[in-house]
Amino acid sequence: MFALADINSFYASCEKVFRPDLRNEPVIVLSNNDGCVIARSPEAKALGIRMGQPWFQVRQMRLEKKIHVFSSNYALYHSMSQRVMAVLESLSPAVEPYSIDEMFIDLRGINHCISPEFFGHQLREQVKSWTGLTMGVGIAPTKTLAKSAQWATKQWPQFSGVVALTAENRNRILKLLGLQPVGEVWGVGHRLTEKLNALGINTALQLAQANTAFIRKNFSVILERTVRELNGESCISLEEAPPAKQQIVCSRSFGERITDKDAMHQAVVQYAERAAEKLRGERQYCRQVTTFVRTSPFAVKEPCYSNAAVEKLPLPTQDSRDIIAAACRALNHVWREGYRYMKAGVMLADFTPSGIAQPGLFDEIQPRKNSEKLMKTLDELNQSGKGKVWFAGRGTAPEWQMKREMLSQCYTTKWRDIPLARLG
């Protein structure tokens, strides 16, 4: 048996946890550079605010409907996600983080001691008690059915946030699959939905009843696996350890357009520095660094430009100095004057778990001495707060930094932002 825990309106809910005054109030969270709506509380949804709706369209409504608006506070959201994970791991045999607000839980053996539905309510109540966040729990014999059950928690409020699909309630499974649009099935995207609809497959139940040989021949083994999972045959196991990454990308849209190469250099240094930190967190070494830049594709009155350059490294490295230097060399290849750049990024690839490589006899570049010790010290200094120690090339207060004009406090990651309670 599997359970899927999904935090309701996660970003908006995190903003409410430390603000009791926002209870039952409409809350929305904006994307990078405060561009569009990416999270809505139930109260905000009731006002008709759409996902992806541009901020400028909501700005006037904010005053009329007293909507509380926040910029994305990723440090807070990551911290709260880790708290939820810790609670679930304390109560469950194994947990797989699927996304920042979704976790698969292994329920093997639990049904011999307690009913899955009752255990789901226990999980829900404990997470609410220890983190202040409300979640829905879908329980089923396969991960795909657990996803469908979790979808049902939002459609069937009478189940109080927990829907269990077990062999004992076969009719519930059939009813749910008959109601669920095929496009809502886990792994079925928009294009696949159109193809299935053309064949008369409009619901999850119709997909479950499809011939597996036909699905495999005309679509893929992956969709065949989905059909089997909808019929209760477990084909996708729990992954407690995430698979090793094949690449790391650090990229942001700028708060202000960049026209100066020095400013772009600062941005690339910062992105390369962050990418190197992530690389060390993965315990990997890279042999390829790519820098890319681009203007806005929507600025019709401005010339468009987009380009990328790749730098191959002679030795595998996780040293920020090597990665920053390579990223800046690549920038020199792609930089063109006369453009208003809106985005840049650095991508690391060609990973290896070891930095050991045999240099050529006449190679001028040799491995840096004490590189691992220096990088470990750097990471430890920055562990309690990003940006305590950084490379000078990224500048001190760049104007191009991402706009977050309505950022909430980092209640769980900064000492100065810890909430205070006054008695009396």
From Swiss-Prot:
**Cellular component GO terms held in the UniProt record:** cytosol
Q: Single Gene Ontology BP term? A: SOS response
Domain named UmuC: residues: 2-189
Establish whether keyword DNA repair is in the entry.
yes
Q: Which GO terms describe its molecular function?
A: damaged DNA binding; DNA-directed DNA polymerase activity
Check the record and name the InterPro entries matching this protein.
DNA/RNA_pol_sf (IPR043502), DNA_pol_Y-fam_lit_finger_sf (IPR036775), DNA_pol_Y-fam_little_finger (IPR017961), DNA_polymerase-Y (IPR050116), DUF4113 (IPR025188), Rev_trsase/Diguanyl_cyclase (IPR043128), UmuC (IPR001126)
User: Which of UniProt's keywords are assigned here?
Assistant: DNA damage, DNA repair, Plasmid, SOS mutagenesis, SOS response
Q: Say which domain of life the source belongs to.
A: Bacteria
The record's annotation in Pfam families points to: DUF4113 (PF13438), IMS (PF00817), IMS_C (PF11799)
Q: NCBIfam families in the record, alphabetically?
A: PRK03609.1
* Protein role: Involved in UV protection and mutation.
Query: What is the similarity comment for this entry?
Result: Belongs to the DNA polymerase type-Y family.
- In Swiss-Prot or TrEMBL terms, this protein is called Protein ImpB
Q: Which gene underlies this protein?
A: impB
